[in-house]
Each structure stands twice: as structure tokens, then as C-alpha cells.
Amino acid sequence: MINSLLTRVFGSRNERQLRQLNRIVAKINALEPEIEKLSDEQLQAKTPEFKQRIADGEALDKVLPEAFAVCREAGRRVLGMRHYDVQLIGGMVLHLGKIAEMRTGEGKTLVATLPVYLNALEGKGVHVVTVNDYLARRDAAQMGKLYNWLGLSVGVVYPGMPHSDKREAYASDITYGTNNEFGFDYLRDNMALSKADRYQRGLHYAIVDEVDSILIDEARTPLIISGPADDSPELYIRVNRVVPNLVKQEAEDGEGDFWVDEKGKQVHLSEAGMEHAEQLLVEAGILDGETEGLYAPQNLTVVHHLNAALRAHAIYQRDVDYIVRDGEVVIVDEFTGRTLSGRRWSDGLHQAVEAKEGVPVQRENQTLASITFQNLFRMYKKLSGMTGTADTEAFEFQSIYGLEVVVIPTNRPTIRKDSPDQVFLNRKGKFNAVLADIEECAKRGQPVLVGTTSIETSEMLSEHLAKAGVKHEVLNAKQHDREATIVANAGRPAAVTIATNMAGRGTDIVLGGSLEAEIHELGEDATDAQKAAVKAEWQQRHDAVKAAGGLHIVGTERHESRRIDNQLRGRSGRQGDPGSSRFYLSLEDNLMRIFASDWVQKAMRMMGMKEDDVIEDRLVSRQIEKAQRKVEAHNFDIRKNLLDFDDVNNDQRKVIYAQRDELLDAESVKDNVDGIRDDVIFDIVARFVPPNSIDEQWDLRGLEATLESDFGLQMSLTGLVKEHEELDAEAIAAKVQERVNQHFAEKEAGVGEETMRALEKHVMLTVLDQSWKEHLARMDYLRQGIYLRGYAQKQPKQEYKKEAFELFSDMLENVKREVVTLLSRVRIRSDEEVQALEAAERQQVEARLSQSQFQHQDVGSYSADEEAAQVQAAQQGIAQVQRDEPKIGRNDPCPCGSGKKYKHCHGQLS
């Protein structure tokens, strides 16, 4: 009550911020008459003037009013577009490192030019992050005209571009690219073998377009550079033949072999299912039924493959979660409906889906480097973003990224009419109503955008509309190449466009069609008369569509997130245009089936509702919103959980990457090597000749053997001690240290100082990279099984932190020892050999990168089952308990004398 009273008196925080920013808008507007009088040359001369003032120590905030006024005037002269006052506010919000929520059609691309221009004046680079390559290239080309006119350089990065071009793009004042490409290049830079091989020059300031899509929807997807591992795909194919014979349970305790946890995207075998699976695997020749069971230690790999195959068959659906194109399984993004070419699910899931679909099974991947988008973007010194829908996720933006959301008012009031949801008993009734609505709109010339959540639904609707004779276009992952054309025509009279989630499409639907696209089609030689004729024709269509009610939005299903629904709605009613929207739901929709309360379904059935009966009720709408809030909270927990774990990895990643940077930047690493060598020798000697110990505790022969095997040094310590009985442990350590130093000095004298320095640097980088790669695999294994610690009344996250630290400490010690051992034993005769080594290593890295992929790590519920932990225990060499008595087989008689099999008696799995 007090809060609401204070808000009424002083306004909300958002209103107070807007009032402060409006004062600066007044200053910018006051400068406009003066700036307008400047000639082109005088206006362009402002850029070097601003740069000098900033270099002399003037703060960006002081330069802001004048810089924004200059950018606004340049936009008017070069692009023919003048920034509105609300766009100036949006630009200031972005400059302050916040998120600007701006409705669709409010000109976010133009807004970004203001803070981009201002921050690029520092000369440290500005990254503009988009959701796809098309938008990156389009925005770089369109807005690049403005920046180039103002004297700033613009680059764009995209997959597969030549190295020199990419390096030049990153050296530009402003760089456009996708979140994937910026993240991928960051990881690649940290696999580079020399400074010259790196692309980026630091993460200074980023503006993220569609910030909710990138920082929230994709936050569950770690960005992974992975290369093929050495496993065989044959087992996936053999297990795939077995899985269709297993039967799904309709209820968790019903009959069948397995049940599906749809929330967590996991599959669990029942007791009967384990027996049935074991029997089928024996019949298929995968298991030896006489001597081993499914859960015998040597068969844990089979368990892993079986779980992956079950998930592939029971959870992942073709044309919903993925499509098959050109003999490959391509993931479909659940949020945007786009295909994610090059991305693969991890943990063998992608291979299992390939086996299911009968396409060539590619080898499993090994992680070479990884980072989450959360930790990537938190590394920028300043981060901001813009989107049409951020306010529903304001808490997450603030708690994870420290980003405040500021809602920017629209330039013109929104007059779109949002109708209440209509709820049907089943999908058939729902789609009948959807088709009737579409046909009615088409008859009166009103364009319709139909939003679906899967390719399957979009194609089913397309078939029905084709039968009814309604002309339409389908925009989904399969029509990705025609996207721009389809969207450009979606606002024409009676146009019907069926689209999978429109989130992040980045192109406005203009009533009457895209005038800009039509004029572009005329070509550069078009006369003014031709352009005028096209414009007049477009104006007629524009007026006709407005009269018909503007763009009508039909939602065929509620998405898990309210934000995605709002994005679909936001495609209509842009810049004060008329429009309308309605969502059609059924009790068979995933959201309603999994998350909505059972009483809603019971009540509708008790009321005797039939297929085509519809219910419009606030109570039901509230239940739907409640269900969406549940899912949003569930997904937030998953993302927060992922971040908690990745923060541990991130601390380690920072240490390793800082060491790599130090190595790449250093002219010589001799001091590092000398320090490492002293530490390693001290530890080795202390193991065999402990400090302050007596000679009875010494193992001189063991020390001699280690020195010979690790360093190629022959040193008779037993003879030395016989000759000099007064030698104590410290003296022996000094003698060994002296001999090792002498050995290194002799090696350096033989090859020359310059060659030795190059070799030291090469060996340190190679060992560090290989050890880090192996460490990432160990961290994956640790994380997958860590949740089982909860059963032992231990806190999994704390256990993970503790063991991750121990693994990291061990890795650093191993790096030291490996470096010294390699440098001791390597035989190099010339500098050319070192260069040849580096060239070969560089080729290997490039080969790995050419085969590497964005691995779309599936982190459904981010938990692990017991079998996974057992797999990791076996792989990490954890000691197995030794039995005093023979092991009882699951099919053997129970020792209790009941006459039952052990698995049905005291060996029954709980």
C-alpha cells in the first residue's frame, strides 16, 4: 500500500528515469538548429573533433548531447531518417548500459546508431550483436552508409569468411555479427598459437539486438567448439534397432518398459523395462547373457547408448525438434523456429537421432573449448540491449547480468485490439476455429499472420488451407531462404502467412507490403515516374488494409513463455497502425497438458463440452498465465543452475586464458620455465628424499629411475651418498637441481638461445591446450554425476566447487611436469625444426576448427541419473569395491531361500 502511494506521488522508477532523460533530449533538440546550419564537411569534421576531446579526457556523457545531435542530422542527410525524441531516449538508455524495451516498428536499428556512434569515438571497438547473419549483413550495409559518412569504419563477421577479412572487420570501429560468431571467435582466439592468429581486440562495448532471445532463450545453450572423438558409430545403429520394441508406459506406475518425464526431457526404464531391454540386447548380440547383465561395469557404455536412443525415439520428434535435410539431422530452434545448421546435441543424443532417421551417424564429439552466452556477455566492459519484450524477464536481466530494463514509450499510441483466448476441448475443434477465422479475414481482404510452435503444425494448416482454396505462404525452417520475400509480402491485402515462432525475425511487416522492397526491385535505373507509380499503388493497398482492420494475428498455441506470445502479438499494430490478435488453445496443447491444473480439464468435461464448443473465461486465462509463469520459473531455475556451475568453469577458464595471453604476448618464457623446473624438481626429490628426513627414509634408486625416465638423466645418487656420507636431504636436492640445470644449459648451448626460447614457448602452449581440453572432459563427467551427492546429504554445488578446484590444481601440476619432461627429452637441432613444429601444430588447430561445430548441449533438467554417474566413475578410474564372496547374478536364485530370482526378491531395484 505504501509502495503504491509513493508511486502515485513520485511516479515509478521507469517514469523517473524517463523524466531525467527527457531533460537531455531538450538539450539535444536545442542544438538542432545550430547543427542543421553546418555544411556536410563541417558536420563530418565533428567526428575527429569529438575523438580528440575524448582522448584529452572529456567524458562520453559530456559529449553525448552534441554527438547525438550530429548523428541525428547525419541520419537525416544520409538515410533520409530523423531520430524521434523517443528514439533519442532509447539511444541514451543503451549508452548507459541498460536494456531498452521498444515495441516492434519503433526503429530499433536506427536507435542503435546513436550509442554506437558515441562509443565508437573511443576507438576501442563496438560490437552490434544480431540473431542471424542476414540481419548482421543487412544492418551493416544500411547503417554503414551513415557511419562511413561520419568517418567511422564498419565491418561484419560471419562464418567461413577469410581470416584476413575477419581480422579487418574486428579492427573496424564498429563490428556487426551474430552472438554465435562473436562467441565462437572468442573461443578460437583462445586456441590461437600466435598473436597474429587472433581476431578480436578485446570486449569493450556490445549492443545486443533481440536481447531477450540471446541472453535468456539461448542462455541454456553453452557454445562449444568440439572435434570428432575416436568412438565408433556402429553401436548407435545396433541399439537403435532394439529400442522400437520397448513399450512406453501411459502412467509412471502403469504397464510398459519406460516412462517419459516431459518437463525434464528425460526417459526412465522401469524394472520390467530393464529386464526386457536386457533380453533384447542379448538377442541382438550386444550383450552376453550368460556372464553379464546390462548394468555390469563393462556394459555402462551400452546403458549410455540405450538412454540416448530412448530419448531420440520417445521425446525428439521430426519436424518439431529437428528436420532431415540433405542426409543430415538439423536442429530446429524451439524459440525462433530457425534451423541451427552446424549445431549438434551432446551426450550421444544427436548420433541416436541420426540412427533413428537412417542417415549417416557422425562420430561423437570431444569438447575443445566452451563458454555460456551468460559468461561471454558478462565479460564486456559495458553491455546493453534492445527488444520489444523484456519487462516480463526484468528480474532475470537484473540478477544475472546486472542490466536494468527501461520501457520506452511508443512514438504513437498502440491501437491493436487483443481479443481473449478461446479454449477448445481438443485440437480438432481448435483448428476448425483457426481455419474459419483465417478464411473470414481473407474474404474481407485483411492480412493474417498465423503463429505456430512447430513445423508440423504449420504444414498441417497449410494442407487444410490449400484444400479450402485459400492462397497462403509458409515461413518455417524449411523455407528459410525465402524468408525476406515472404515477410515483405505478409502485409498485403488478404495475404495469409503461416510462420513458426516469429521471435527474432527482425523484419517489420508493413501494411500493404514492403514499399522499400518494391522500389529496390525496380533497380538503380528506375525513373522518378516509375517510383511514383509504385508508391501510389502501394498507398492504395496500404489504405485498403487499414480499412480492413490491419494485420490480424492468430496464435495456434500458447508458448511456454509469455514473452514469445507478446512478440507474436507485437508484429501487429506497429507505429499506431490498426491491428488485432487472438490465441486459440485446446486441452491437448503441451502447455495445458503438462503444466495447467487438472481441474480446468475436469471442469470443461463435466460441463459436457463438445469438440467445437468454445470457452472464453478470465478464470481459464488466469490458469493459462499461471501455467506459463510455472514454466518460466522452471526455465529460470535451469538457467541459474547452469550459470552456477559454469561460474566455476569460468573462473578456471579466465586463469587458463590469461596464462595463454601472457604466453602469446611474451617475447621469452625462460623465467617461467626456470621457475616451473625448480618447482617440479623440488617436488620429485621431496617424494623420494623427504626434507628433514634421515637416510633410512630415502629411496635413492626410485629417484634415479624417475630422473632417467622423465628427464633422460643418468645420475648415480647411491654412489654419491657413499662417497659423501655427510650429505643430507637438502644437499641431495641441491645436487639434483644443479644437474638438471646443467642438462638444460647443455641443451640450449647445442641448439642456440633463439631456438630454445621458441621451443619453450611452443611446448608450454601445446601442453596447456591439451591439458585444458582433457580437463574440460573431466569437468563434464564430474558435473553429470554430481547430483547423486544429494543422496548422501551433501550439497552438490559445494561438492562440485571443491572437486573442480582439486581437478584444476592437479591439472596445473601436471602441466608443469609435462612441460619440463618434454623440454628435457625433445631433440631439436635447428630453429627450422621448431618452426616446422609450430606450423604442423597450427595446421592441426585449423583442421580441428574446420571440423569443429557449435554443439547444442541439451541441458533439459540439468540432472543426471545413477547410470551416468557409474559411467563417469568407471571412466575416471574410481576404485571399485572388492567382494569377499562371489557376486550374485540378477537371474540367480536369491540366497535367502525364497525360491525367487534374486532380482525379484532381495535384489529388486527400488
From Swiss-Prot:
Cofactors that this protein relies on: Zn(2+)
Cofactor descriptive note: May bind 1 zinc ion per subunit.
EC number: 7.4.2.8
Gene3D superfamilies assigned to the protein according to its UniProt record, in alphabetical order: Helical scaffold and wing domains of SecA, P-loop containing nucleotide triphosphate hydrolases, SecA, preprotein cross-linking domain
Recorded superkingdom: Bacteria
Cell compartments where the protein resides: Cell inner membrane; Cytoplasm
CDD domains per UniProt: DEXDc_SecA, SF2_C_secA
Topology within the bilayer: Peripheral membrane protein
Feature: compositional bias, Basic residues: 900-910
Alphabetized Pfam families for the sequence: P-loop_SecA, SEC-C, SecA_DEAD, SecA_PP_bind, SecA_SW
Region entry Disordered, spans: 558-580, 873-910
Leading EC class: translocase
Zinc found in the keyword field: yes
Binding residues for ATP: 87, 105-109, 508
Amino-acid positions noted as binding Zn(2+) in the UniProt annotation, renumbered to this chain: 894, 896, 905-906
BP term (GO), one: protein import
PROSITE patterns (alphabetical): SECA, SECA_MOTOR_DEAD
Cellular component, GO, one term: cell envelope Sec protein transport complex
Residue ranges, compositional bias (Basic and acidic residues): 558-568
SUPFAM superfamilies xref list: Helical scaffold and wing domains of SecA, P-loop containing nucleoside triphosphate hydrolases, Pre-protein crosslinking domain of SecA
Keyword annotations of the record: ATP-binding, Cell inner membrane, Cell membrane, Cytoplasm, Membrane, Metal-binding, Nucleotide-binding, Protein transport, Translocase, Translocation, Transport, Zinc
Similarity section: Belongs to the SecA family.
PANTHER family: CHLOROPLAST PROTEIN-TRANSPORTING ATPASE, SECA INNER MEMBRANE COMPONENT OF SEC PROTEIN SECRETION SYSTEM
Quaternary structure note: Monomer and homodimer. Part of the essential Sec protein translocation apparatus which comprises SecA, SecYEG and auxiliary proteins SecDF-YajC and YidC.
Main function: Part of the Sec protein translocase complex. Interacts with the SecYEG preprotein conducting channel. Has a central role in coupling the hydrolysis of ATP to the transfer of proteins into and across the cell membrane, serving both as a receptor for the preprotein-SecB complex and as an ATP-driven molecular motor driving the stepwise translocation of polypeptide chains across the membrane.
Full protein name: Protein translocase subunit SecA
